[in-house]
Amino acid sequence: MWKLRTASSLILLILLSGGALAKTSKVIATGGASTIEGSAGGGIVPWAVINGYASSGEWSATAMLTSVSVDDFSLRVVGASLAIDNRFEFSIAKQTFDLDSLGGELGQDIVGVKYKLAGELLYSAIPQLTLGLQYKRVDDFTIPQAVGAQDDSGLDAYVAASKLFFDAIAGRNLLLNATVRATKANQIGLLGFGNTKDDSYQWVFEGSAALLLTDNLAIGYEYRQKPDQLSFATENDWQDIFLAWFVNKHLSVVTAYTDLGSIAGYENQQGWYISIEGAL
């Protein structure tokens, strides 16, 4: 399993390598950041982009550390990804969800794959389109089962479309993304999958907008619709306002103010998000 020291070591290795291990040629910021589920995107929404800066015939790798702290809970994520030919993305992530007010923790492992179907982010008439899969499995099914979840693992599938519009607002470039996801996950999987009365997939929408203030600095907004399947507590949609700084092609930092709504009966869960990613 991915531990904090493992991800930290990977990021340090990436920064010290100075890109010596991988030749990459994509434009800075076009690989996005790493989401809390490990795939390329913003913070809570996967985009159609492929992580890192590998173009055709190239490869790249990333490692990330993420922390989200809201009123009664905190989430820690470590992960890594591999991109090949600007078409395939493979990712892994380990989530640890601390129940700060209740005591204890939940966790899950996520393995993801993404494939570019068509289009380009920058220089094509149609947006970049990707198909993604995320297999998730909780560490301990005791609490999810107690609150009514049906399964301890599940598979999310999504289609994402991303496009960068040049000189869109006050001469600045604007990235728009739309994602449609089929999922059974409760609280992105931390509370299991489905419920004892309905184990069917739910269709949800996720969207992002990012305005590039400079070539390597962006502000944006994300919205993630959530299924509401467990009777013991309402599950609200998520949203955030973020600032992303792509220091160079090997280091990026994303911070955000997040509104996660009601989680496990605790209302108005709001707080801060920070993520650091190193890329080869």
Regions found by a protein language model. Name each.
Residues 1-33:
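Cleavable N-terminal export/targeting peptides
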Residues 7-9, 118, 167, 185:
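General helical structural elements
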Residues 17-19, 80, 171-172:
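Short, flexible coil/linker elements and helix-boundary hinge sites characteristic
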Residues 23-168, 213-217, 227-229, 234, ...:
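Transmembrane beta-barrel domains of Gram-negative outer membranes and organellar outer membranes
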Residues 149-229, 237-238:
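Detector for outer-membrane/organellar transmembrane beta-barrel domains
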Residues 240-280:
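C-terminal appended segment following the main domain
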